[in-house]
């Protein structure tokens, strides 16, 4: 696939849709809800927030050059999903999503289907209004407006991103940070839900939200504040289908390995022993009672 243009090739959507159609045909009876692509906007999110360098710099990196050489293509022709950030890349990703939705429905599957986005709570400080609006359009709105016909939009949000006239700002000195280096800001979820629904017109499913920390008391505090934001949305009539915490178990967090601990259940990687945390008991109580104190 990468040798044929990857996620900038017009041939990719049909191949992806064929795959999704087969999954739905053979396993659809086991699926309660489907997300075709996880975080369709992730590449733009990482570059916009300064977490990942620009594509110009990435294509000059030794690993990128080696990968393209092994594939027999140029660095400019290497287009993995994570780096489909150009307008052509965005168009191909969204075409793949829409064709996948059609293929899933054509398979006879009846479960609701959508896509998930890393919806950024982009806020501006004095002087940053214009650039914040530009990033909001590039990262969020360009995708949220292209979900017509879906059953829902999956929202994944962990923190806010502040912008001044120069671009993304680091967290303020002395502010509480998570193990991911994010600002502790659970209120971001409410803002993300509001923007996702207002822009897409779709019901919202919170498909990821959580806290990487060694202090489980802070996890409970974070989730409680985030859920209060969800309740605010529900009270105003915004259709929020549900809330999914990330994650049940301490997970493998890509290049960060097992260092960040998001889980409601701890995992000892030496023995694989699982230990239920207080946050799991607390969240289970919220779910059973369907109330927040």
What is the predicted function of each stretch?
Residues 1-293:
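Non-catalytic scaffold segments within catalytic domains of secreted glycoside hydrolases
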């Amino acid at each position: 696939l990468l040798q044929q243009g990857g996620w900038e090739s017009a041939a990719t959507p049909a191949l992806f849709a064929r795959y999704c159609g087969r999954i739905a045909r053979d396993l659809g009876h086991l699926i309660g809800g489907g997300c075709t692509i996880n975080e369709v906007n992730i590449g733009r999110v990482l570059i916009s927030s300064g977490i990942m360098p620009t594509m110009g710099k990435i294509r000059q990196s030794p690993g990128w050059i080696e990968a393209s050489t092994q594939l027999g293509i140029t660095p400019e022709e290497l287009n993995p999903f994570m780096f489909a950030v150009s307008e052509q890349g965005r168009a191909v990703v969204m075409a793949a999503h829409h064709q996948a939705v059609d293929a899933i429905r054509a398979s006879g599957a009846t479960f609701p289907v959508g896509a998930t986005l890393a919806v950024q709570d982009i806020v501006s400080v004095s002087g940053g209004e214009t650039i914040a609006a530009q990033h909001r359009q590039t990262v969020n709105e360009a995708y949220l407006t292209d979900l017509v016909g879906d059953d829902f939009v999956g929202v994944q949000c962990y923190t806010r991103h502040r912008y001044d006239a120069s671009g993304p700002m680091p967290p303020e000195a002395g502010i509480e940070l998570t193990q991911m280096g994010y600002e502790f800001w659970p209120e971001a979820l409410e803002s993300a839900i509001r923007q996702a629904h207002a822009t897409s017109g779709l019901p919202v499913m919170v498909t990821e939200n959580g806290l990487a920390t060694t202090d489980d008391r802070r996890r409970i505090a974070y989730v409680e504040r985030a859920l209060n934001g969800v309740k605010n949305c529900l009270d105003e009539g915004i259709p929020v289908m549900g809330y999914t915490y990330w994650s049940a178990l301490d997970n493998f967090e890509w290049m960060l390995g097992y260092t960040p601990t998001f889980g409601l259940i701890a995992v000892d990687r030496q023995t694989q022993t699982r230990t239920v945390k207080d946050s799991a008991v607390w969240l289970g109580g919220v779910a059973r009672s369907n109330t927040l104190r």
